[in-house]
């Protein structure tokens, strides 16, 4: 059996043993409904409150501003639809970017069919949105700006504080999808003037199927899910106690480990980028060149003359697991909307590989990838008419 190297931590992470350990009693012993009044539910009630406290501490938010959801997609949907419907008397215009996660883009497209107007702002070749562009897009009808904290494909960390200041000045709600940022970037919702923020536990070593939405006190938002009075009447459904406990523990660990973890990941990322650039000709690093403005675990390359899907299968056969884009879209054969938005031609975007690093990756893993990947690229290019055409054109120039 080949060595196995998982490098798709931006798609999902494993649940850390300490997190699982804290969750387990809530499946078997402490199974009471947290909304019940009797004492049997006291432990579950306390556990949910502790998780809320841990999340609020991580964001510098108030405890009553944290609402648990089934994940990042629900949190994004709630933020966008909830603000749109609750504030439509004030205006019907939303501003976002072309490189958002599909949970934002598809929600925005849904709202367009409902009569809302949406501006999808372009980004530069490194994936940054311009604060000036946001300013120029604002109209009297604008009720919400939604910009992701960090991009899941190319690792770009957006100028969130500046956008928050602009939105505060213009009296417009500001939402950020921070699903990729938790555990990698310092987040302070007060200092950054963030009104709404989405997160998902499985991106920071917590369980799948649980997330949270931070909603600043005073924000006018409509419910997405109707039913019982859970989450202070804002989000119906019996609380997923074990999941919520896991999210709380995972975010606490993520905050504690962040400085050390980021340094480790940055070093591994540097080794991987330098190694690929030194060993493989005609490659393009996608995303920010200034590594301080990029997620410490993100590497995204385009290889001229290569099909991304074929590359993934070749790597898989060698025990290396990466991605050609976000996992939510990798079943589709269309090139990544993010890579097209940063100006890559169709065929270059098609030949992209994202390697996202995480807690279990080592220098040995990096060296193994650097041993295997160049051989695969060389072999595939020898069979590729795209590569042949590219080299011919290059020689003619």
Swiss-Prot record:
Cofactor(s) essential for the protein: pyridoxal 5'-phosphate
Q: Name one GO molecular function term.
A: metal ion binding
Top-level taxon of the source organism: Bacteria
Q: Which residues bind [2Fe-2S] cluster?
A: 328
Q: According to the UniProt entry, which residues carry N6-(pyridoxal phosphate)lysine?
A: 203
Q: What is this protein's function?
A: Master enzyme that delivers sulfur to a number of partners involved in Fe-S cluster assembly, tRNA modification or cofactor biosynthesis. Catalyzes the removal of elemental sulfur atoms from cysteine to produce alanine. Functions as a sulfur delivery protein for Fe-S cluster synthesis onto IscU, an Fe-S scaffold assembly protein, as well as other S acceptor proteins.
UniProt cross-references to Pfam families, sorted A to Z = Aminotran_5 (PF00266)
User: What is the recorded name of this protein?
Assistant: Cysteine desulfurase IscS
Enzyme Commission number(s) from the entry: 2.8.1.7
Protein family membership: Belongs to the class-V pyridoxal-phosphate-dependent aminotransferase family. NifS/IscS subfamily.
Q: Which residues does UniProt mark as catalytic?
A: 328 (cysteine persulfide intermediate)
Describe its partners and assembly state: Homodimer. Forms a heterotetramer with IscU, interacts with other sulfur acceptors.
- The entry's pyridoxal 5'-phosphate-binding residues are 72-73, 152, 180, 200-202, 238
Report the subcellular localization.
Cytoplasm
Instruction: Give start-end of the signal peptide.
Output: none
Top EC class for this record = transferase
Biological processes annotated in GO:
[2Fe-2S] cluster assembly; amino acid metabolic process
Q: Which reaction does it catalyse?
A: (sulfur carrier)-H + L-cysteine = (sulfur carrier)-SH + L-alanine
Its GO CC terms are: L-cysteine desulfurase complex
Q: Name the pathway it acts in.
A: Cofactor biosynthesis; iron-sulfur cluster biosynthesis
Q: Which UniProt keywords apply?
A: 2Fe-2S, Cytoplasm, Iron, Iron-sulfur, Metal-binding, Pyridoxal phosphate, Transferase
């Amino acid at each position: 059996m080949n060595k196995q190297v998982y490098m798709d931590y931006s798609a999902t992470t494993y649940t850390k043993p300490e997190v699982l350990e804290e969750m387990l009693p809530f499946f078997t012993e402490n199974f009471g409904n947290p909304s019940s009044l009797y004492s049997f539910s006291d432990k579950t009630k306390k556990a949910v409150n502790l998780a809320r406290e841990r999340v609020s501490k991580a964001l510098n938010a108030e405890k009553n501003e944290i609402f648990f959801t089934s994940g990042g997609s629900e949190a994004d949907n709630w933020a966008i639809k909830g603000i749109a419907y609750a504030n439509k008397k004030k205006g019907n215009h939303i501003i976002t970017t072309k490189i958002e996660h599909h949970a934002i883009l598809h929600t925005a497209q849904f709202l367009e069919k409902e009569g809302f107007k949406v501006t999808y702002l372009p980004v530069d070749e490194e994936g940054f949105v311009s604060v000036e562009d946001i300013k120029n897009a604002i109209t009297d009808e604008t009720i919400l700006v939604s910009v992701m904290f960090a991009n899941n494909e190319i690792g770009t960390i957006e100028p969130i504080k500046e956008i928050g200041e602009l939105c505060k000045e213009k009296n417009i709600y500001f939402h950020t999808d921070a699903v990729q940022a938790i555990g990698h970037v310092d987040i302070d919702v007060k200092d950054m003037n963030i009104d709404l923020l989405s997160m998902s536990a499985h991106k920071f070593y917590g369980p799948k199927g649980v997330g949270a939405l931070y909603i600043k006190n005073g924000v006018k938002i409509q419910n997405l899910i109707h039913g019982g009075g859970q989450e202070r009447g804002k989000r119906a459904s019996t609380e997923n106690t074990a999941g919520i406990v896991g999210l709380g523990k995972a975010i606490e660990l993520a905050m504690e480990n962040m400085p050390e973890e980021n340094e480790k990941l940055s070093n591994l990322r540097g080794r991987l980028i330098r190694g690929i650039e030194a060993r493989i000709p005609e490659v393009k690093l996608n995303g920010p060149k200034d590594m301080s403005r990029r997620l410490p675990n993100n590497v995204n390359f385009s290889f001229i003359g290569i099909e991304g899907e074929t590359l993934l299968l070749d790597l898989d056969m060698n025990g290396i697991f990466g991605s050609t884009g976000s996992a939510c879209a990798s079943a589709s054969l269309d090139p990544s909307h993010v890579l097209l938005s940063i100006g890559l031609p169709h065929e270059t975007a098609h030949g992209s590989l994202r390697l996202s690093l995480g807690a279990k990756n080592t220098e040995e893993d990096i060296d193994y990838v650097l041993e295997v990947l160049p051989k695969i690229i060389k072999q595939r290019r020898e069979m590729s008419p795209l590569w042949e055409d590219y080299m011919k054109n290059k020689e003619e120039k």
